[in-house]
């Protein structure tokens, strides 16, 4: 599979020359999202987001899940069991998303993959005539975002990014109260995120976990050897091969709400103050003890 750089270069040139051929079947032309006709969907990426995404999709009675796709065997197994428990039905299992792109009967794909797959997967889905629900962030980098927009304008497919707080009733109510002036004039917004997630493991070479297709996981990214516990969530933090750090993980939510509350457009400039801080040992660090007459702060 080509790496991300060659993918962007090739597809940008192709769009400029309008060289793509529509691969829509007559059946696909007759399907309109939102109609009463059955809509065949596929899930790509069957990890942490699947419980919410699957339940949300199945709330619509005309939805039929055609495929459950993931590069890890046990993810497919768990999602298959979940789907059967919810519906009493089964869906086709697939590791390679390209086979789903080729299926003309699939109308839309719900993508919940690692970040580096987002723009590439969405563009290939649109090229094959499919609508896309895309988990945040919509791309791995700004160049891919521009490319994604070009694809959407050319293929005229529905692409929805999953910024769920935008559609949360609680958030919408809060934004309306701020707009109505219930807290006065807003002049500053502070975005933050707390989590009790465990420390990120140090990267060490390791064997590819059983059931994982490491080549397909890497997809459009550069090729490298597997390092411990990369595939399951920690891909977010290791360099920029697959993830976008907390900027793409949670800041995409929190900064969006902060900007929404202020009623402003995009910033003129961004200042970042950050550090690469990690612990290489579990030994106690130096600390300060304060004696408060029998009570202590350490």
PLM regions: where:
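Mid-domain beta-loop-alpha active-site segment that forms a flexible
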Residues: 52-53, 162-170, 193-267
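Conserved S-adenosyl-L-methionine
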Residues: 269-274
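N-terminal glycine-/serine-/threonine-rich beta1-alpha1-beta2 phosphate-ribose binding loop
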Residues: 1-134, 143-158
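Short acidic/polar active-site loop segments enriched in Thr and Asp
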Residues: 107, 187, 268
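Conserved small/polar residues in nucleotide/adenosyl-binding loops
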Residues: 279-286
